[in-house]
C-alpha cells in the first residue's frame, strides 16, 4: 500500500525508458503530427526509444535495401567479437560478381569482380554508400561461409533485438518471399547501429564512394540538406517495396530517427522524412529527469544510527516530452510502507517516483535508498520507541 507522497520537482528536467503504455501517455499532449504520404512510418527519439508519432508502424512490409542495415550490424558484431578485423582482406568469389548473375541484374552494385581483394572496411563502405549487393555477398561469404549461413546470423540478431515484425531471407534485400520488417523494427535496429557502431557509423554519412574507377553518390539525398544535420542512415527501393528511407538527424545533443516505408518516389520519401524530423525537433525536448545516485528527498528512519535516510534512484533516466508541456510537469515520490525502520541496506526499493503531466501519470521509476542505516544504540532506539509510539 502506498502511504506517503512527496513533491520534489516541478519540471524542467526529465526523461527515460518507460513502458509502452506510459510512453503513449507521454506524447498524448503533443501537437498534431504531420500528414505523411507513405505506407508506414515512425519517428523515434534516439535517447529514450520513445515513438513520437507513427502510422502502420508494425505492419510487415518489404524492407528492400534497408535489409543491409542488419547485414552491416552483423559485420560489426563480428568485428566486435574479434572474429574478423576491418583490415582483413577478402577475396571476392564468383557469386559476388555481377557478370552472368541474373540475381543482380538492374540492382545496385559496388562493381566488384571475381578475384578482387578488398578490405572488410571498404566492403562495408560499398554496402552502405553504394548499397552494393555484391559487397553484401562478399562479406557474407567471408564471415559465414555462405549466404544462407549469414542470413541465419541476421535472424539470430532479429531475436536478440526483439524485432517481432522482422524476418530476413537475403543478405541484400532483393525481393524474396517471406522477407519482411516494419517501420518500428527498423527504427529499433537503427538505434542499435548508432549506439553500437561508433567506428563505422560515420560511413552512413559519406556522400560518395569511388571504386574500380566508378564514383557513385549516396542515394540518401537528405545528406545534402545543410539545415537538417542528417548523418545517416539508408535508402531502399524495389518495385514491391516502393521507396524506403531511414534518416537520423542531430539537433544539439538530441537525435531523432525517422523511418518511411512505401513512399511513392525517391523525392517523396525524403520529403516525408524531413516533415517528421522537423516536427519532432520543433515540438519535443529530450531531457534528463533523474540522475543516478542523486538525492531526490530524505525521510525519517526509526531505530537507526541516524535520523534521516537519503532516497533517490540508481539510474539516469531520460524522457522526450512536448515542449509546451514542460511547465506542467511535476514529480512525486511515494513510499510503499508507513515508516522506514533500521537496519536498512543501500539500494533497497522503498517506493516509486512518479512523473505527472498536469494530472496524468506518464512515467514511474523505482525509489531506492542511497545509503545504508545501521541499528542505533540502545538509548537512541529506546528514545525512538517512545517517540514513535506516542
UniProtKB/Swiss-Prot annotation:
Membrane topology qualifier: Peripheral membrane protein
Record SMART domains: PBP5_C
GO annotation (BP), single: regulation of cell shape
GO terms for MF: serine-type D-Ala-D-Ala carboxypeptidase activity
Keywords, comma-separated and alphabetical: Carboxypeptidase, Cell inner membrane, Cell membrane, Cell shape, Cell wall biogenesis/degradation, Hydrolase, Membrane, Peptidoglycan synthesis, Protease, Signal
Compartment(s) where it occurs, according to its Swiss-Prot or TrEMBL record: Cell inner membrane
Signal peptide (from-to): 1-23
Catalytic center residues: 65, 68, 131
Catalysed reactions, semicolon-separated: Preferential cleavage: (Ac)2-L-Lys-D-Ala-|-D-Ala. Also transpeptidation of peptidyl-alanyl moieties that are N-acyl substituents of D-alanine
Pathways involved: Cell wall biogenesis; peptidoglycan biosynthesis
GO cellular component, one term: plasma membrane
Entry keyword Chaperone: no
Protein family: Belongs to the peptidase S11 family.
NCBIfam families in UniProt: PRK11397.1
Function: Removes C-terminal D-alanyl residues from sugar-peptide cell wall precursors.
PANTHER family from the UniProt entry: D-ALANYL-D-ALANINE CARBOXYPEPTIDASE, D-ALANYL-D-ALANINE CARBOXYPEPTIDASE DACD
Name by which UniProt lists this protein: D-alanyl-D-alanine carboxypeptidase DacD
Protein's organism: Salmonella typhimurium (strain LT2 / SGSC1412 / ATCC 700720)
